[in-house]
Amino acid sequence: MDLIGLLKSQFLCHLVFCYVFIASGLIVNAIQLCTLVIWPINKQLFRKINARLCYCVSSQLVMLLEWWSGTECTIYTDPKACPHYGKENAIVVLNHKFEIDFLCGWSLAERLGILGNSKVLAKKELAYVPIIGWMWYFVEMIFCTRKWEQDRQTVAKSLLHLRDYPEKYLFLIHCEGTRFTEKKHQISMQVAQAKGLPSLKHHLLPRTKGFAITVKCLRDVVPAVYDCTLNFRNNENPTLLGVLNGKKYHADCYVRRIPMEDIPEDEDKCSAWLHKLYQEKDAFQEEYYRTGVFPETPWVPPRRPWSLVNWLFWASLLLYPFFQFLVSMVSSGSSVTLASLVLIFCMASMGVRWMIGVTEIDKGSAYGNIDNKRKQTD
């Protein structure tokens, strides 16, 4: 390991990043709370302000990926589609196999200039995650319980609110419903066999109802669906902890722009269309594992400096008083004070580790394990 790599793996560096992220995130959450008074007066202004506040937080994670770890992401796409990216609303269908797939999606959104307006259909539990979950509440993220009887009306109502959103956005949906694991895949393919559907090798069976209602509610304001198939070179197994340690990964993403008029309006036909899409995605993944590349032309959108500038702003604002506080605590010489300081560090470290654990595959939800079994017996 070289000197820079050794430095990136040190706890002190991680402490700095975590402190800046937590402190700035809580400040942003507090400001977002104050902006609630704007909503009844000017809803569109409220949305624009909160999109910028959201960027202040989410771009810090993009900075870690792009500038700290140096992870590269190559897009494979039709060159004719490139002028549309970042210039239109779109529904993004992304495979859900890697711990940092969401971060790669954010990186793409940042390079297209619409990170602050990125939306996602997320499980309701994430709304309670400090900083990120609280931030998402103010930017109208769509939360679901993953119980269709409860979600049918609430998700549709939330989606309809986005029809008059004032700026361009990407709406991400993981149609598989949960992150891929071998156990979930085995159960999912049992369901596919019971329903007479073709087996998938690299994906779980897609949940079609959430996609169908998203298309139905946003069809008139979203001109295209972006089918994104993500993988990593050399069988890399990327983790958020690896990114924090400065480990460099190499992501490849195949993006297909599918015009909305090509997607059936009928719910049953839309569901069949989505199943066919995932069969195609599976074939693309199989080809990638065989050849190491996706179809179409490789394209690397230029890295923008603003995520780094944003982090440097927060670091310069927060680190000086932080180090002043540390010096005063250490110089006090009080054993109680020092013990309290150590306790604070331990609690902060545990809190950050818990937030990182939300992304870890082996600590993911049991949704795909339990719910699929129930469906198979229905």
From Swiss-Prot:
Query: Per its database record, what is this protein's job?
Result: Converts 1-acyl-sn-glycerol-3-phosphate (lysophosphatidic acid or LPA) into 1,2-diacyl-sn-glycerol-3-phosphate (phosphatidic acid or PA) by incorporating an acyl moiety at the sn-2 position of the glycerol backbone. Exhibits high acyl-CoA specificity for polyunsaturated fatty acyl-CoA, especially docosahexaenoyl-CoA (22:6-CoA, DHA-CoA).
- The motif HXXXXD motif: which residues? 96-101
The Swiss-Prot or TrEMBL note on domains reads: The HXXXXD motif is essential for acyltransferase activity and may constitute the binding site for the phosphate moiety of the glycerol-3-phosphate.
Keywords in alphabetical order? Acyltransferase, Endoplasmic reticulum, Lipid biosynthesis, Lipid metabolism, Membrane, Phospholipid biosynthesis, Phospholipid metabolism, Transferase, Transmembrane, Transmembrane helix
Listed under catalytic activity are: a 1-acyl-sn-glycero-3-phosphate + an acyl-CoA = a 1,2-diacyl-sn-glycero-3-phosphate + CoA; (4Z,7Z,10Z,13Z,16Z,19Z)-docosahexaenoyl-CoA + 1-hexadecanoyl-sn-glycero-3-phosphate = 1-hexadecanoyl-2-(4Z,7Z,10Z,13Z,16Z,19Z-docosahexaenoyl)-sn-glycero-3-phosphate + CoA; 1-octadecanoyl-sn-glycero-3-phosphate + (9Z,12Z)-octadecadienoyl-CoA = 1-octadecanoyl-2-(9Z,12Z-octadecadienoyl)-sn-glycero-3-phosphate + CoA; 1-octadecanoyl-sn-glycero-3-phosphate + (4Z,7Z,10Z,13Z,16Z,19Z)-docosahexaenoyl-CoA = 1-octadecanoyl-2-(4Z,7Z,10Z,13Z,16Z,19Z-docosahexaenoyl)-sn-glycero-3-phosphate + CoA
Q: Which InterPro entries does the record associate with it?
A: Acyltransf_C, Plipid/glycerol_acylTrfase
Known EC number(s)? 2.3.1.51
Lineage of origin:
Eukaryota, Metazoa, Chordata, Craniata, Vertebrata
For this entry, the protein name equals 1-acyl-sn-glycerol-3-phosphate acyltransferase delta
